[in-house]
UniProtKB/Swiss-Prot annotation:
Organism: Cycas revoluta
Signal peptide location: none
GO molecular function: lactoperoxidase activity; metal ion binding
EC top class named in words: oxidoreductase
Enzyme Commission identifier(s): 1.11.1.7
GO cellular component labels: extracellular region
Cofactor (UniProt): Ca(2+); heme b
GO biological process: hydrogen peroxide catabolic process
Subcellular localization(s) per the UniProt record: Secreted; Secreted, Cell wall
Protein name: Peroxidase 1
Reaction equation(s) it catalyzes: 2 a phenolic donor + H2O2 = 2 a phenolic radical donor + 2 H2O
């Protein structure tokens, strides 16, 4: 989502 917190998709 933001930065790299929930960008693990």
């Amino acid at each position: 989502g933001f930065d790299v917190v929930d960008n693990i998709k």
